[in-house]
Amino acid sequence: MNLYDVIKKPVITEGSMAQYEAGKYVFEVDTRAHKLLIKQAVEAAFEGVKVANVNTINVKPKAKRVGRYTGFTNKTKKAIVTLTADSKAIELFGAEEE
């Protein structure tokens, strides 16, 4: 698996923004990715970033209904990435203007 295919997108929610201020970043990742691969992908995608810890969560599919038809959403995997104290911060929203 290519390192640049591991991270799909950042998760932007109220809970993830609370963790963002504590130095933890939440990403949606490929369901086949393991913790070491996620760590390597984050360090390759963001220059100057050192990962201290990776926690993963498997999100189960939810039942959804459209009229009388029932289906399920896709299963996903989330990764909570903690950076070391001497690491650069990840800019999720681009550079700040002065």
UniProtKB/Swiss-Prot annotation:
NCBIfam families: PRK05738.2-1 (NF004361), PRK05738.2-4 (NF004363)
Protein name: Large ribosomal subunit protein uL23
Lineage start: Bacteria, Bacillati, Bacillota, Bacilli, Lactobacillales
GO annotation terms (biological process): translation
GO cellular component term of the entry, any: ribonucleoprotein complex
Annotated family: Belongs to the universal ribosomal protein uL23 family.
Keywords per UniProt: Ribonucleoprotein, Ribosomal protein, RNA-binding, rRNA-binding
Cross-referenced HAMAP family: Ribosomal_uL23_B
Gene Ontology MF terms in the entry: rRNA binding; structural constituent of ribosome
Function statement: One of the early assembly proteins it binds 23S rRNA. One of the proteins that surrounds the polypeptide exit tunnel on the outside of the ribosome. Forms the main docking site for trigger factor binding to the ribosome.
Domain of life per record: Bacteria
Assembly and interaction partners: Part of the 50S ribosomal subunit. Contacts protein L29, and trigger factor when it is bound to the ribosome.
